[in-house]
Structures are given as C-alpha cells and as structure tokens.
C-alpha cells in the first residue's frame, strides 16, 4: 500500500502541473498557481520523507505535514473553481483524489497513534 500512496501522491503534483498550464494568463491565476504548485508537489515529497522516518513520532509528524499540504491543495483547487479560472469538470477528478489521499493520511495517523499509545 505504501508504494501505491507514493505513486498517487506524486501523481497529484503532476496533474496539478498539467492543470496550471491551462490557466488563463492573468495575475490572479499566476499568484494562485504558485501557491498550488508548491503545496500539491509537497504532498508527494513529504509522503516520501514520511516513508523514510526514523521513528514513529517522526513518521507521525511528517504525515501531519502531508495532511496540511493536501488540505491546502484542496483549498486552492476550490479557489480556482470559484474564481472561474478553470471549469469545474476539469478539476473534479483531481479534487476527489486529493480528498481521498487526505482521508487515507488521516486514517494512517490514527492507526499509528493507537499503536504508539498501546506500547
């Protein structure tokens, strides 16, 4: 499962990169694109870092970062949609994937926290 999540989190960043190339050449789109590029690509890079964590506490901390970046990505996708910078149909699948990854990461955190608590 770990490898699947690595692939999925990396794919989110790649899909956002493709999406940003479709945005109009407007100042607002440019500013938002910088924000969403950073957080969406950070999902995959921080998940990879979590997989190399030295301890369960380190793993949990890195997963929290993944959760934050995933949530921020979701926020910026909503902004793109609500500001009419991209058609909703174009980001529907991406929003769903980001939400699924967020749910998986939150569930993983809860599992590790229980494991740590029972030690």
Q: Whereabouts are the PLM-identified features?
A:
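Short, C-terminally biased terminal segments at protein or domain edges
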Residues: 1-119
């Amino acid at each position: 499962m770990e490898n699947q999540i690595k692939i999925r989190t990396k794919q989110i960043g790649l899909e956002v990169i493709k999406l940003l190339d479709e945005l109009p050449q407007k100042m607002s789109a440019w500013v938002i694109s910088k924000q969403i590029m950073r957080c969406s690509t950070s999902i995959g890079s921080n998940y990879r870092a979590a997989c190399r964590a030295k301890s369960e506490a380190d793993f949990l901390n890195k997963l929290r970062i993944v959760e934050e970046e995933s949530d921020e990505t979701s926020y910026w996708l909503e902004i793109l949609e609500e500001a009419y910078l991209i058609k909703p149909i174009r980001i529907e699948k991406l929003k769903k994937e980001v939400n699924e990854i967020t749910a998986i990461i939150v569930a993983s955190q809860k599992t590790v926290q229980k494991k740590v608590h029972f030690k």
